[in-house]
């Protein structure tokens, strides 16, 4: 009774883990037999209690966790805040996705952790609780889906779906949640069907490669060992893995703590000894593994260690190879049957947080941290070393140490509340998570114009690419605007920066335009379909538009006008000017240049004598097809073009032009295809084809006719000649000639067809063979050159009534020589004739000594209409601005008397109108196809006004100057202080000025543009002809980027030399919800377009955040459409790590065929090592050391990679099983060609130990290199051909063995099973064994510490010591590398 009183009574619920510990203790204390007796009693007790209680499971037993409601609500609130931050441009899409997933993952995890305590408190005998937590059926994850929430799912590609399933199976799923959860179910069904066979085949191959490994000895006598240490310089090995690694192993060396020996060599390690090592903090423990065993075809007891079935050393005769193969293959088979509903993306859990213990103020050393962004886009401080953070409250000071590489989420001197997160500790580096680099494409939500800051590289990543790198965090902005198709605009009179009344954003456009050429008359047809059946209010009638387009009295000019300060212009931006023409009725007999005049002003604005001032191309002389130009007997003299001619439309400069002397030339059309040499041509030479015949795989013919194929250097030229084929008689003399033109009216007198030729024809003789020939009659297009143009129709009279000292001469050029072929590039048309206006001036003039003339603009204001004229004079002038033009307020058809060259209208009422319903300013671009494209901006749909700001006060001097100075008064009346500043569009800020003189000063380089200071030193001419003298105060310098005022008058120079900062600057960007006025935050993000005295107008813009390393698609100022790729983010994500995706990885590693499994770094190092060590040590030593080094490194890498996959699934496989497999696939070497030996052939595979022993026996060096065999190749390269033949390729293996006369010694298990004999394992392992030499007993063992890290920590230098080099093995210096993958 006394003894019983001392017994401790435990009244606790016992779970699976506690039972395991109890059994382990019982075995240690009482042994196996007594323990089994105790466990029988426990089992009987359990059955009796289960029968008595009769537990059943019903749907009411599934109790939802009460805290679920507010946890989900809290997660939704965080997601809403995150969505707002993303909308404001504070976080980008990847950060948003990452944080959203972590928010819901953390919520799901909290619910899962709440589940067990909730059951324990509310209903400890709940059947669901008892079943799931006893391990009888179901696990915590499955029960969590029943009573918690299903959480996040992965799609079939393994990517995370952003939408979590908030319901559990007890509450029921919505339709959306059901469809999302079906992804996981389908994946599970497919995995069960498909992957199980893969896992089974993997098991078969694994068993095949190691079936002959049996424990044959107690001790092989090795002195090598592998060092395992719990802690290193870089990383900690977790304690459970350290214990699992050591338990059951045998020590390779004595262990000393101080001077006391606590464990001996060849002693097996139990849990007690391992715990003692951990307690005493032993630095490194040297253990024996299958890698260190000195045999190839068997293994000794000490190198294998304890048997997993009973806690003692493995018995002799144990078939440990088959056990190893089954241990690795079987978990894969089991795990494929398990369905993974959650996708298992976050296998490692969330990061650890440091929380404040109570309220107080934070203090830390700011020099030890630097600002950064967390992976969720939050601002934080990163500390590189241990950082001490002090929390001061009223009565206590608490210090917290933050480990290195952690994020500090609070600022210095910030007040924190109790339990507030102050730091985030990075996850432990020892994780088994798969990381993969993923590209995330961000697409544009709306159409508009791209804008970025100087933080993006303006030069693209590669030449001719449109990808730009982001070196630091910055915003991309899409400035809103509605695109207008060029088909509708191209016949209207609207140009860049015009105001428009047509509502392009309201209706869809459908327009068909066609040009028909009838003789000399050019008629234009414009067909406009009904734009919309329902006419909405505010949409004007389209008769006004048709009036503009149909009665096209005016001609469009697409001129490239370059200014003196051309560095301010974007290369792709061109300003458009308008030149009026008389109506068609007035010039019925006149030449009407429909395609428009292009005025070519040189870059510097200087014309030389006889230089081309303008040119235009008549569409009548334009051909779509290729062909040959013929003048007949017409002579032509070539005119060399001036070198300073501007390139027109990006076409290369013409070397020569041909001036026509008579008025007719001919064009003979033909279809030409130039094909690469390797093309497959599907038609024969000199064959006749129809229209739309397939010529090659991708090309069909446009015309029918005769095929002619010419093979030239590296290309094939295929021509199709349309026309008639004639076989001439002897009487047809005219057809015996080749290459002649026949005028109309000449018939064929003696042929069957007596019809005369209606048009010109071209006769060409074709000779397929020497004897045969025929004649091809081809149609000819005849062109007449029109008379010279009346210059009065092009340019009005001299309005300034100056002396006419500059003449314009009309010259027609033919752009191709006689007989030269014309070739069209893709679908472009070919211009045959160009009419040019050549500048010349009177030689009798006094200024004739001047060899150059300058072009400049003159602007005159009358009745609110500003008229711009271009003057070409022999005086020096400047071209230094681009004019802002808008339509008049009553914009419709502009009457002829208002049409002056280069008109421009004061935007006095234009800006106010532009914000009404259907007004807008258009901007002109060249799109990706180099076509003109318009963007509608400054309309009510994409702009908004902020203000008025009542609290804005201007300086008194400005107010006084406004009173005194009429100039600023006019400017105030004209509406805005400024308009938008884009790339190269610098507008005049004072719209009613005639600019006689203007100086441009380079002020500051910003954003790849020049900031401009405009010094306004000019006179104002009003419509009454009065000239307002400028006031001293009017020397105002305007900085368009900041709208600050400078006064240059001497009285104010000392007071106002500095900038006076204002609240809002022009062109500035505002994010949404930003406070810029006292009234509160404004609601939209945008760019400041107009600044007025009391309000601002913003153009809507959408911000996108880009972090370093992102790639921006598209160029600055380019139009983007909805759905275009905007940014590519490259980031690392955790791959879904279930075993079905891990198994192929295990197979890749074991079959040594994965591409990325040898890191290039290691491969280069090993190659370098082999190369240089051979030079240092000589041929034999270098090869042996290099091979041993490579084998050791690859073995360690392979073990780590395989363990990563299984540990990520929570599957524990002992390292020794993997080591046995890996030892077999790394035990062979490849005989190399250097130093030919008489024993082995180059390229032969032999075992490493065999190579060493043969070298010692023959006393000559055998050169070899390490090689990694896959498990399949290793199975086919064994000592037994019977085993190989029974695996695969039976006929080949047996035939080869017969030819070579191989002998099978029947050492393995499989060959004995095949032949029906007893297997050499278990009790029969002693039968028929060939005893190996006992050479190892003579070796003097030198005990040294060998350090080789098998696991994730650093590997150190290894020294293998032997007495002599050729006696046993080589003493090698092995440098090991970390973080490599082997293939």
Swiss-Prot record:
Cofactor(s), names only, from the UniProt record: Zn(2+)
Catalytic reactions of this protein: RNA(n) + a ribonucleoside 5'-triphosphate = RNA(n+1) + diphosphate
UniProt-listed InterPro entries: DNA-dir_RpoC2_beta_pp, RNA_pol_beta''_euk, RNA_pol_Rpb1_3_sf, RNA_pol_Rpb1_4, RNA_pol_Rpb1_5, Rpb1_funnel_sf
Class in the EC hierarchy, top level: transferase
Gene Ontology BP annotations: DNA-templated transcription
Pfam families linked to this entry: RNA_pol_Rpb1_4 (PF05000), RNA_pol_Rpb1_5 (PF04998)
Presence of keyword ATP-binding: no
One annotated GO molecular function: zinc ion binding
EC number(s) given by UniProt: 2.7.7.6
A GO CC term attached to the entry: mitochondrion
Keywords: Chloroplast, DNA-directed RNA polymerase, Metal-binding, Nucleotidyltransferase, Plastid, Transcription, Transferase, Zinc
Annotated coiled-coil segments of the chain: none
Comment on bound cofactor: Binds 1 Zn(2+) ion per subunit.
Protein purpose: DNA-dependent RNA polymerase catalyzes the transcription of DNA into RNA using the four ribonucleoside triphosphates as substrates.
Family: Belongs to the RNA polymerase beta' chain family. RpoC2 subfamily.
Xref: NCBIfam families: rpoC2_cyan
Subunit composition and interactions: In plastids the minimal PEP RNA polymerase catalytic core is composed of four subunits: alpha, beta, beta', and beta''. When a (nuclear-encoded) sigma factor is associated with the core the holoenzyme is formed, which can initiate transcription.
The name this protein goes by in its record: DNA-directed RNA polymerase subunit beta''
Annotated source species: Aethionema grandiflorum (Persian stone-cress)
């Amino acid at each position: 009774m006394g003894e019983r009183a001392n017994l401790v009574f435990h009244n606790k619920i016992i779970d699976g883990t506690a039972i395991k510990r109890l059994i382990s203790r019982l075995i240690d204390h009482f042994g196996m037999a007594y323990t089994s007796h105790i466990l029988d009693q426990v089992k009987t007790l359990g059955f009796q209690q289960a029968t008595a209680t009769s537990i059943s499971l019903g749907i009411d037993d599934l109790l939802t966790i009460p805290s679920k409601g507010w946890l989900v609500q809290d997660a939704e609130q965080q997601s809403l805040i995150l969505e707002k931050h993303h909308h404001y441009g504070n976080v980008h899409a990847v950060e948003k996705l990452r944080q959203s997933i972590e928010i819901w993952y953390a919520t799901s995890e909290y619910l899962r952790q709440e589940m067990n305590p909730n059951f324990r408190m509310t209903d400890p005998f709940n059947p669901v609780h008892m079943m799931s937590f006893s391990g009888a059926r179901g696990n915590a994850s499955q029960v969590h889906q029943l009573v918690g929430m299903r959480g996040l799912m992965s799609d079939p590609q393994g990517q995370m779906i952003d939408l979590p399933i908030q319901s559990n199976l007890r509450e029921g799923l919505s339709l959306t949640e059901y469809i999302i959860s079906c992804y996981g179910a389908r994946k599970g069904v497919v995995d069960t069907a498909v992957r199980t066979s893969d896992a089974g085949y993997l098991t078969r191959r694994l068993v095949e490669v190691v079936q002959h490994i049996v424990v044959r000895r107690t001790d092989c006598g090795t002195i090598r060992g592998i060092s395992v240490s719990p802690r290193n310089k870089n990383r900690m090995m977790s304690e459970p893995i350290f214990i699992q690694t050591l338990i059951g192993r045998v020590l390779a060396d004595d262990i000393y703590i101080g001077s006391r020996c606590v464990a001996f060599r060849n002693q097996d390690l139990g849990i007690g000894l391992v715990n003692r090592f951990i307690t005493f903090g032993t630095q490194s423990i040297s253990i024996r593994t299958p890698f260190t065993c000195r045999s190839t075809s068997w293994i000794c007891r000490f190198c294998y260690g304890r048997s997993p079935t009973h806690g003692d050393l493995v018995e002799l005769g144990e078939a440990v190879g088959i056990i190893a193969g089954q241990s690795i293959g079987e978990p894969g088979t089991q795990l494929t049957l398990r369905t993974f509903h959650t996708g298992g993306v976050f296998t490692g859990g969330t990061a650890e947080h440091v929380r404040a213990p109570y309220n107080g103020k934070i203090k830390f050393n700011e020099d030890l941290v630097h600002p950064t962004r967390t992976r969720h886009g939050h601002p934080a401080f990163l500390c590189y070393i241990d950082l001490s953070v002090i929390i001061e409250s009223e009565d206590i000071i608490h210090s917290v140490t933050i480990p290195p590489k952690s994020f500090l989420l609070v600022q210095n001197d910030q007040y924190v509340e109790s339990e507030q997160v102050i730091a985030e500790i990075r996850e432990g580096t020892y994780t088994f998570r798969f990381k993969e680099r993923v590209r995330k494409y961000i697409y544009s939500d709306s159409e508009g114009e791209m804008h970025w800051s100087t933080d993006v590289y303006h030069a693209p990543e590669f030449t001719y690419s449109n990808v730009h790198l982001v070196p630091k965090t910055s915003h991309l902005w899409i400035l809103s605007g509605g695109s207008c198709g060029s088909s509708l605009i191209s016949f209207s009179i609207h140009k860049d920066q015009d105001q428009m009344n047509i509502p392009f954003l309201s209706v869809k456009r459908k327009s068909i335009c066609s040009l028909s050429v009838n003789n000399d008359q050019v008629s234009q047809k414009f067909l406009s379909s009904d734009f919309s059946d329902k006419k909405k209010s505010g949409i004007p009638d389209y008769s006004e538009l048709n009036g503009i387009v149909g009665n096209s009295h005016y001609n469009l000019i697409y001129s490239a006008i370059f200014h003196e300060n051309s560095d301010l212009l974007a290369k792709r931006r061109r300003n458009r000017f308008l030149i009026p023409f008389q109506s068609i009725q007035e010039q019925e007999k006149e030449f009407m240049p429909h395609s428009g005049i292009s005025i070519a002003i040189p870059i510097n604005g200087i014309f030389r004598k006889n230089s081309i001032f303008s040119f235009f191309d008549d569409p009548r002389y334009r051909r779509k097809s290729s062909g040959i130009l013929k003048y007949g007997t017409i002579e032509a003299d070539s005119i060399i073009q001036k070198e300073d001619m501007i390139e027109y439309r990006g076409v290369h400069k013409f070397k020569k032009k041909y001036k026509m002397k008579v008025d007719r030339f001919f064009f003979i059309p033909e279809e030409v295809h130039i094909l690469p040499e390797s093309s497959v041509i599907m038609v024969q030479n000199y064959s006749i084809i129809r229209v739309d015949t397939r010529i090659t795989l991708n090309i069909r013919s446009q015309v029918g006719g005769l095929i002619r194929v010419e093979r030239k250097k590296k290309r094939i030229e295929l021509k199709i000649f349309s026309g008639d084929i004639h076989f001439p008689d002897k009487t047809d003399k005219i057809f015996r000639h080749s290459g002649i033109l026949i005028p109309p009216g000449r018939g064929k007198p003696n042929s069957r067809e007596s019809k005369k030729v209606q048009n010109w024809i071209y006769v060409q003789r074709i000779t397929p063979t020497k004897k045969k020939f025929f004649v091809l009659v081809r149609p000819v297009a005849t062109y007449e050159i029109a008379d010279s143009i009346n210059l009065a129709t092009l340019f009005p009279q001299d309005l300034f009534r100056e002396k006419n000292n500059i003449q314009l001469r009309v010259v027609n050029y033919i752009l191709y020589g006689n007989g030269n072929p014309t070739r069209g590039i893709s679908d472009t048309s070919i211009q045959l004739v160009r009419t040019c206006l050549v500048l010349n001036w009177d030689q009798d003039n006094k200024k004739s000594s001047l060899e150059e003339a300058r072009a400049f603009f003159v602007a005159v204001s009358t009745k609110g209409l500003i008229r711009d004229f271009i003057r070409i004079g022999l005086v020096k002038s400047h071209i230094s601005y681009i004019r802002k033009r808008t339509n008049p307020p009553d914009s419709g058809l502009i009457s002829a008397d208002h049409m002056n060259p280069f008109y421009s209208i004061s935007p006095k009422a234009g800006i106010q109108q532009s914000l009404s319903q259907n007004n807008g300013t258009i901007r002109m671009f060249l799109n990706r196809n180099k076509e003109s494209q318009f963007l509608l901006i400054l309309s009510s749909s994409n702009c908004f006004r902020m203000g008025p700001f009542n609290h804005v006060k201007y300086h008194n001097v400005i107010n006084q100057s406004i009173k005194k100075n009429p100039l600023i008064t006019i400017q105030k009346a004209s509406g805005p202080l400024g308009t938008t500043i884009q790339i190269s569009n610098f507008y005049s800020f004072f719209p009613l000025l005639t600019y006689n003189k203007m100086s441009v000063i380079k002020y500051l380089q910003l954003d790849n543009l020049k900031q401009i200071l405009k010094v306004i030193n000019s006179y104002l001419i009003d419509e009454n002809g009065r000239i307002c003298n400028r006031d001293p105060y009017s020397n105002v310098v305007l900085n368009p980027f900041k709208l600050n005022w400078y006064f240059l008058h001497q009285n104010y120079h000392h007071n106002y030399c500095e900038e006076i900062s204002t609240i809002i600057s022009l062109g500035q960007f505002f994010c949404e919800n930003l406070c810029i006025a006292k009234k509160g935050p404004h609601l939209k993000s945008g760019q400041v377009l107009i600044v007025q005295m009391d309000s601002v107008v913003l153009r809507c813009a959408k911000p996108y955040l880009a972090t370093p390393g992102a790639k921006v698609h598209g160029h600055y100022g380019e139009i983007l459409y909805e759905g275009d790729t905007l940014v590519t983010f490259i980031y690392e994500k955790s791959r879904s790590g279930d075993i079905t995706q891990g198994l192929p990885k295990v197979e890749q590693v074991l079959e040594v065929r994965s591409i990325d499994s040898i890191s290039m770094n290691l491969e280069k190092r090993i190659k370098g090592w082999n190369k240089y060590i051979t030079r240092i040590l000589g041929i034999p030593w270098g090869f042996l050391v290099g091979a041993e080094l490579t084998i050791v490194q690859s073995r360690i890498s392979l073990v780590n990679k395989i363990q990563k996959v299984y540990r990520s699934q929570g599957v524990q496989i002992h390292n020794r099983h993997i080591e046995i497999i890996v030892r077999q696939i790394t035990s062979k070497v490849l005989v190399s060609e250097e130093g030919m030996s008489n024993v082995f052939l180059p390229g032969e595979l032999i075992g490493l130990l065999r190579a060493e022993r043969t070298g010692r026996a023959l006393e000559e060096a055998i050169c070899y290199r390490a090689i990694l065999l896959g498990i399949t190749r290793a199975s086919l390269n064994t000592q037994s051909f019977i085993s190989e033949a029974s695996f695969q390729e039976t006929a080949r293996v047996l035939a080869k063995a017969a030819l070579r006369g191989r002998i099978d010694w029947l050492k393995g298990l499989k060959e004995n099973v095949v032949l029906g004999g007893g297997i050499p394992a278990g009790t029969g392992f002693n039968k028929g064994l060939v005893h190996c030499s006992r050479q190892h007993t003579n070796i003097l063992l030198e005990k040294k510490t060998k350090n080789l890290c098998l696991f994730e920590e650093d590997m150190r230098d290894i020294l293998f010591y032997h007495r002599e080099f050729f006696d046993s093995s080589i003493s090698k210096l092995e440098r090991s590398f970390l973080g490599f993958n082997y293939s």
